């Protein structure tokens, strides 16, 4: 893979862009303004790419030991280039957000600042770092909805934003459990290293169960039957994550499952937002 694509974690960038797309179509019910949608996806993708790059900048010393094949420690990308690229990407994203409005600009700016502080200070603070990542990820969908910003957009977007927050929070806690031994050796404070694996698992499971129990709610708030159809595999995969073994190995399995849950969640809200007249038009 190209070292710059690896540096920005291109798969995460694509996921963030899809989040913005989902947020826009969910809040607008597919009443798409192509310019606003493209800007929303670009802003979110650029800010996410910059945040991922700055994360590697501040992790360079740890990566020299744990992940020497990452672009900076391997020498494929210099530290100076990576730093300039990260700030440049976030800067372009923030500038583009100003074209959409002051609220969009404010969200993009604050998210960029939060990602910098996360990489520099908050990543090793345990639950606080997890909360920052979960909030930033949920804001991808929120930003998409904000880019539409008409009618009852907020009523339609708050549930997918909340579910994204809870799923991401669970995944970040589970990732801390998976990395327990390495984090303990490197004095990294995570929920698992400070409170124990069992306690960390308990918090992650509570967040997932809240998501599962309330997941039918969108069907009563205007989302169509396609949401319910996609909800079935979502619940199956998420339940498997909840029931994973309370161990580092179980955490590794759960983290992979939760990536699938996140993707299915976006699909559910995107398809569930299609207006009925659109669905009936394509029925035989």
Swiss-Prot record:
The entry's keywords: Cell membrane, Lipid biosynthesis, Lipid metabolism, Magnesium, Membrane, Phospholipid biosynthesis, Phospholipid metabolism, Transferase, Transmembrane, Transmembrane helix
Family matches, as CDD domains: PT_UbiA_DGGGPS (cd13961)
Transmembrane segment boundaries: 10-30, 37-57, 76-98, 102-119, 126-146, 217-237, 260-280
Topology relative to the membrane: Multi-pass membrane protein
Catalyses which reaction(s): sn-3-O-(geranylgeranyl)glycerol 1-phosphate + (2E,6E,10E)-geranylgeranyl diphosphate = 2,3-bis-O-(geranylgeranyl)-sn-glycerol 1-phosphate + diphosphate
GO molecular function: geranylgeranylglycerol-phosphate geranylgeranyltransferase activity; magnesium ion binding
Signal sequence, start to end: none
Superkingdom assignment: Archaea
HAMAP family: DGGGP_synth
Classification via PANTHER family: CHLOROPHYLL SYNTHASE, CHLOROPHYLL SYNTHASE, CHLOROPLASTIC
Protein name per Swiss-Prot or TrEMBL: Digeranylgeranylglyceryl phosphate synthase
Organism: Metallosphaera sedula (strain ATCC 51363 / DSM 5348 / JCM 9185 / NBRC 15509 / TH2)
